């Protein structure tokens, strides 16, 4: 996986074992770790964070609060609570490959720790897809998308840890999606996060994402990127330098603008500005 150059760093290669780790600029996310471990066994320890673990290959055996468990590939998400002792070891001959997102300890209430200890493996395809999408957004440094994905992951995990209660069909306040769109349109480059927009219209981030997507067929973070690209194109055609356009329209830097520009238009900002492909 190509990791964002400004965030990821390879912190260890030894005897076929590799580890990448970085701290993204996303509220609620403490650290991201990717590991390819062939024969590494790690001793009993604790974290002050919640662990969202995706196994992509192999099998991990571990003890959590002195009870044996396994983290399985492809189908499940393992959620380990903070302050609870656990270890880990390869349970397959070729080792394992995993992706881990560590969430701040206050992302979930302490009352859910016991449920996570009792059943850390969550077999939920939707949660697996959302967690993987969160990891990809963090890899690429897409903070807006990561914020949105995180909101959905947190909501889904909490639903499982509270016993999967029947979801009440609550009508959102009238016009949530429309009011959110007005806020995004008013200052696309100045929006700092989806959570702020959700708070402004009086709903949770996950609620806003669902309502907006249902209304417009696109999640709010993707809509916002599109609006920022519209502004960037206008400024580029007016002759502004790409590096200045990037920061003026809400992108972190020119590389961030270029990546989204390529996704939409299959060319770079500089070539677009020059009228070449």
Regions found by a protein language model. Name each.
Residues 56, 128-139, 181, 185-188, ...:
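Regular secondary-structure segments
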Residues 18-116:
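N-terminal regulatory/effector-sensing and dimerization cores
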Residues 185, 190-230, 237, 246-275:
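Basic/polar phosphate-binding segments, predominantly the helix-turn-helix DNA-binding elements
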Residues 1-25, 274-277:
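Actinobacteria-biased recognition of intrinsically disordered, low-complexity terminal regions
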Residues 37-38, 161-169, 209-216:
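Short, Lys/Arg-enriched N-terminal segment that forms or immediately precedes the first helix
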Residues 173-181, 225-229:
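Short, leucine-enriched amphipathic alpha-helices that occur as contiguous helical runs
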Residues 110-169:
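Amphipathic alpha-helical segments enriched in hydrophobic/aromatic residues interleaved with Lys/Arg
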């Amino acid at each position: 996986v190509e990791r964002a150059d400004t965030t990821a760093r390879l912190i260890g290669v030894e005897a076929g074992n590799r580890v990448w780790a970085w701290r993204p600029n996303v509220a609620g996310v403490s650290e991201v770790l990717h590991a390819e471990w062939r024969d590494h066994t790690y001793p009993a320890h604790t974290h002050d964070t919640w662990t969202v673990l995706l196994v992509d290959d192999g099998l991990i055996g571990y003890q959590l609060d002195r009870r044996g468990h396994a983290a399985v590939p492809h189908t499940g998400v393992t959620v380990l609570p903070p302050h609870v002792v656990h270890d880990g070891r390869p349970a397959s001959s070729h080792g394992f490959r995993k992706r881990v997102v560590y969430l701040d300890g206050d992302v979930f209430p302490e009352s859910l720790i016991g449920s996570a200890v009792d059943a850390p493996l969550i077999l939920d395809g939707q949660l697996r897809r959302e967690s993987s999408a969160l990891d990809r957004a963090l890899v690429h440094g897409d903070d807006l998308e990561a914020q949105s994905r995180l909101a959905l992951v947190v909501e889904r995990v909490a639903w499982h840890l509270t016993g999967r209660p029947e979801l009440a069909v609550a009508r959102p306040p009238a016009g949530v999606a429309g009011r959110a769109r007005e806020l995004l349109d008013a200052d696309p480059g100045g929006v700092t996060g989806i959570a702020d927009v959700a708070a402004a219209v009086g709903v949770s981030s996950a609620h806003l994402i669902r309502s907006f997507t249902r209304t417009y067929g696109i999640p709010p973070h993707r809509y916002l990127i599109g609006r920022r690209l519209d502004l960037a194109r206008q400024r580029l055609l007016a002759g502004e330098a790409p590096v200045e356009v990037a920061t003026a329209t809400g992108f972190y830097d020119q590389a961030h603008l270029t990546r989204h520009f390529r996704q939409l238009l299959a060319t770079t900002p500089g070539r677009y500005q020059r009228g070449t492909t």
